[in-house]
């Protein structure tokens, strides 16, 4: 039987350390990118939610009419909803997102406002791999209640 001499250990663990270091760095960068993407989407959704709420409350009091059951219901129009959403976005403190735009602001039933916003997300560290960024789009709906 052939036995290896224990004093004949040659080699280096440097490639192993470099490989694990690169793997750890990749995990950290991917984790920070995923967190950044989540926070950017949350900011965009918060803006869309606020714009939808402002648009849902943009009705004129002269348009409020009682239903046959005696409940007061406001009537929203598309121009009012669009103007209120755009006005909210110009005044909102978090509206400095890159490439923020109002895609649509509509009222599907005359009682609720639906706002769709779009933005562009760029990774915080490795943006060289995605120079144009990644497009994000969110939609929020808010209903006006007149009680």
Segments predicted by a language model, with ranges:
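Alpha-helical assembly-interface signal, strongest on the long, hydrophobic N-terminal helix that forms
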Residues: 1-81
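Generic short beta-strand segments
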Residues: 117-123
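Short secondary-structure boundary micro-motifs
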Residues: 12-13, 19-21, 27-28, 87-89, ...
């Amino acid at each position: 039987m052939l036995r290896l001499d224990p004093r004949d250990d040659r080699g280096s663990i440097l490639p192993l350390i470099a490989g694990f270091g690169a793997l750890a760095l990749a995990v950290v960068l991917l984790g920070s990118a995923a967190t950044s993407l989540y926070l950017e989407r949350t900011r965009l959704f918060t803006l869309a939610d606020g714009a939808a709420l402002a648009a849902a409350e943009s009705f004129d009091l002269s348009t409020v009419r009682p239903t046959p059951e005696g409940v007061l219901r406001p009537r929203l129009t598309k121009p009012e909803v669009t103007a209120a959403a755009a006005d909210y976005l110009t005044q909102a403190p978090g509206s400095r997102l890159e490439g923020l735009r109002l895609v649509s602001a509509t009222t599907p039933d005359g009682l609720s406002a639906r706002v769709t916003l779009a933005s562009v997300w760029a990774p915080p560290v490795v943006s060289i791999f995605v120079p144009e960024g990644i497009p994000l789009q969110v939609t929020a709906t808010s209903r006006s209640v007149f009680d």
